[in-house]
């Protein structure tokens, strides 16, 4: 047993070293505070070689076999549990073929090169002031939703279409070929099949049984919504630069004073604290503002995964997450609070994994993407709840958002609930078809035609408002061929919400939710499957019906539910929240600059952040009253 124990402790120590080295360089290069792309590629390679090492896999199997001859005890059971975690990680990532190992090294190099070139690419559009400006993906998306000028919106979409061409002209299809070769060298049909097997422990056929069923269940609602939009706004309503504006642009603008960017941090802290969410002593670093060269999509990564070490001492997490907001842009406050809840949900999950090895609490395979995204998307789903909006969304005078505006929002967005989910669904339909193409068929025009065909079939429009090849997830091997995880997660989110509503009658500021999530979803990490965690909390296996039912609700049904939540919240005697803070050390940074921290208190940090935003973005200072 001593030999097995020594191996286990060595794996924990060595993994922490290679994981942290990779994640520290990931953060610095993605945040544009370092240009050491070669160093990151080397660290990524070292990490990949560790998790795909056949010798380590053989050693773990040998150690587990030796433990079978040891008498039962709590110590043996704990050690066996930890080694099985390592077994799952190595079996999930093993690369037995020399050819595949060489291809993996080549993939890391070419993806690093594409990332470095993408960081230097500047996109431009016409902003609300009528000026041409450099724009991040977040700014382009927000402009498409909120800018009342059609020509300005079209400039944002043109930039996204230009990005598609840039991606194709800068080696993406060579990466697709190499990914397929890597997968085939290991016996898989293509890279999409490889990723689904590795990440979700499903076959492609099993995945599309779920996705095809959801597509069929929501098709009529989507077709009806597109028809009604055209009837209401004319033939140009579904043009890609008009679609999101016609769906929610005016309502987003009307909500803007109630969801100011500067108050987003305070609202995140207060809401999570009242839910009973604790970060168990983690160190959090948040980089929230757009910056030239910074990666243009929110993410959450943990350089130090949580676990109990060999002395049963708690190793608290070190977690970074990011947004890329332009605080004085209309709609930026809503996007920022969504990112804080989403990435903050990821951070809460990974800060609360309480197993005995870091392999259980890292975000890559065998951790299911659907499982990980369930945690973040559950948290950001609260932002659409009418009782959350009434308690937290307030303007500069301290007035809550009026019921009439909440109703107007529902009238505007509920008919397009199916379209919103199909906006996720279209990505796996495209990626599966992309990786099924032969190497010879992978040319720019064929792939662009494939993208447009998928958008036409799934979204019901000739071109999507977010063109498929402009989605950053497709470029990175960790997130490529994984986007279906968001839809599977949202199905689990609505199943989870239904459970809490049955059990407690409400979600917003319910202090029972954080502890329940921590116990059933977070603590096990990847030692349980996604389905097992759902059964543990809700008592039923994975069930897609809750999301489909939500998409198919009428406006009247959605408003009746919202009104009931508002009425109940107004008279509810909320129980006390379990703690006065999030039990985390938090730093808000802008590159190398520290904007605020909670050395004194969470309240002081939020006030310091709000003050910094007011000084640097005075136009954003609306709706900043305390609630």
Provide a role label for each language-model segment.
Residues 193, 332-340, 347-378:
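Post-HEXXH active-site segment of zinc metalloproteases
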Residues 1-4, 88, 340, 348-349, ...:
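C-terminal, non-catalytic "cap/extension" segments appended to globular domains
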Residues 128, 132-139, 146, 173-324, ...:
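Active-site-proximal, well-structured secondary-structure segments within enzyme catalytic domains
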Residues 167-171:
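Amphipathic, heptad-repeat-like alpha-helical segments
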Residues 259-260, 320-341:
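Short pre-active-site segment immediately N-terminal to the catalytic Zn-binding motif
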Residues 211-220, 365-403:
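Post-HExxH zinc-binding segment in Zn-dependent metallohydrolases
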Residues 1-166, 441, 477-481, 582-627:
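N-terminal helix-rich structural modules
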Residues 311-318, 338-339, 343-355, 389-394:
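Alpha-helical recognition segments enriched in aromatics with Gly/Pro capping
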